[in-house]
Amino acid sequence: MRYFSIQAKGWIQWGAFGLCALMAVIAITIGFSIQETPARAALPNVPTHLGVASCSGSTCHGRSEADGKIVRQDEIMRWQEASSPTGAHSRAFAILSEPRSQQIARRLGIGNAETAPMCLGCHAENAASRGPRYQQSDGIGCEACHGGSANWIEVHKLGNHANSVRAGLVPLESPKVRASVCLDCHYGSADGGQFVNHRIMGAGHPRISFELDLFSTLMQHHNEDADYAQRKGLTSNVRVWAVGQAMAVERSLSLYSNPSLGTEGAFPEFTFFDCHSCHRRIYDSQSFTPTTLDNPGRPIPVGMPPYNDENMIMLSAAARVAAPALAQKFEADSRAFHAAIAKDRASAVAAANRLRGSAANLASTFQSASFSRAQIFAIIDTISSEAISPRFTDYEGSAQAVMAV
């Protein structure tokens, strides 16, 4: 079901038949929606998700034009825009019915993708407690990111952001908070249905990559103007990018260290490793041409698949400029982690924990850092210079460099 409102200044003239037909369609749609996703009783300490419909009034976020005095008020329209990246979240559930998704589900043997927990963890809101207007078909709705609204929606209507946060609204203006929320689906979490392992990608799922600032920009439904700054403060794009890189490294290492996720049978979980280290052309002829390059950041034996270090490379560039006191330790821990993978899993997990601590320190440092214009250009120069560019030996790291600059 899509959400919209018709404002007083732009009434559309309907004939009696047309109006009756519209009301009938809406009634039928609502009836099917309620049947499709029944309400779930509120659980202790679990905020109830009221659904996108609870935000879609014309005095809230459901206008058809961005003429609100404080916020745009057309956020729902932007969220459901079919032709724009801003509407991607609203399409998350619908995509499960498409042929590619159904083929992936068949290859995995998990039944219908629209009901498989492996898919619903990220293609629908992970809402344990649901109000009567919640619809799973809304995909990733407002509360998937802003948090279940039952405890804060009435406070939110009064316009005091700090009070809304105290009532349970997720403060996504904080780069660390936003990164944590986005990473759950755009990188993975240990919660059910939120980890894309190599089996899922082998069945046809797209590769997973994460860049917080770019993703935030593509998804943005609001304007960061003067009154936004007054309510929430402003955060520079570079700070969002740097914190996102640090927390992506943290999340990756945390999942790798998880004994239930880090291995798959007798093998390591390949999703953590550089895709193109294995997905390369094989030469059997005498005119063999090497398809790999030495990488100074990965002290590993020839022929061993390297860990996917795309976010580590970007974090090194940011740290060298904005946190030089921490950069040396982070890079030493990074090299030690790559080397430990060549030993055994216990050594690799111990090294991963040390590297994760270094990344966490950088995330906290960048969270409060003020990136000057000179530092921003220095980071760009570092990414493209001989200091870092020799580490771009594979697609993943190179793609991160493009997204960064």
Language model features: what each stretch is:
Residues 1-12:
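N-terminal secretory signal peptides that target proteins for export/translocation
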Residues 18-29:
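Bacterial N-terminal signal peptides
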Residues 29-41:
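Signal peptide processing junction and immediate N-terminal pro/mature segment
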Residues 39-43, 64-106, 134-140, 148-400:
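Primarily the internal scaffold of c-type cytochrome electron-transfer domains
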Residues 40-57:
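N-terminal module-boundary/linker segments of secreted carbohydrate-active enzymes
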Residues 52-70:
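N-terminal signal-anchor transmembrane alpha helix
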Residues 55-57, 119, 142, 182, ...:
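Short cysteine-rich clusters marking metal-coordination/redox-active sites
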Residues 93-132:
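Mid-chain, structured segments of secreted extracytoplasmic proteins
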